[in-house]
């Protein structure tokens, strides 16, 4: 069961990090499907004797996109529910992406966010940078894990896994 939860959390983390790219990709694929010249064409018998239904094929492709669109909607809803501090954290976490190297035993995104977070918060609030500096990096990993867990629970309630 732990392996299943870890796999789901990894899936959720990817959706959280890549939401903007995936949303653009989904929109492009939807547009491609809808602009396909075969949509709306009559059914055409093929050489094998099977009937091709271009509109049906397009509908099936659009149905596949609906699952991905439900994930995007979920991620956007979760973002809206987050407190401002965590929403800004998530923006920075996305910016950092999946920096792969470890810096003193921590994933590379942690020091990146630890550096940028107080700067962004100070800029947005007009307060001093020092007011937002968190010396303990575990705060950021705890926020990240909490966002992942919350998103995974909501996704499970909506039947988005398997």
Which residue ranges define each predicted feature?
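N-terminal interaction/assembly modules
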Residues: 1-81, 155-162
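Generic detection of well-ordered alpha-helical segments
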Residues: 73, 80, 84-88, 138, ...
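Generic structural marker for isolated residues within well-ordered, non-membrane alpha-helices
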Residues: 75, 110, 126
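Short amphipathic alpha helix immediately N-terminal
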Residues: 81-121
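DNA-recognition helix of helix-turn-helix
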Residues: 118-123, 127-157
């Amino acid at each position: 069961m732990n392996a299943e939860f870890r796999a789901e959390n990894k899936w959720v983390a990817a959706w959280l990090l890549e939401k903007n790219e995936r949303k653009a990709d989904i929109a492009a694929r939807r547009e491609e499907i809808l602009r396909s010249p075969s949509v709306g064409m009559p059914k055409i018998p093929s050489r094998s004797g099977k009937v091709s239904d271009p509109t049906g094929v397009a509908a099936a492709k659009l149905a596949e996109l609906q699952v991905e669109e439900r994930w995007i909607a979920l991620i956007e809803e979760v973002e809206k529910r987050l407190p401002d501090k965590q929403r800004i954290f998530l923006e920075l976490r996305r910016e950092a992406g999946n920096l792969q190297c470890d810096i003193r035993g921590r994933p590379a995104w942690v020091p990146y966010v630890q550096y940028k977070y107080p700067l962004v918060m100070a800029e947005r609030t007009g307060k001093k940078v020092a007011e937002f500096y968190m010396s303990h990096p575990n705060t950021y990993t705890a926020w990240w894990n909490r966002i992942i867990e919350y998103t995974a629970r909501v996704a499970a309630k909506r039947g988005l896994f398997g």
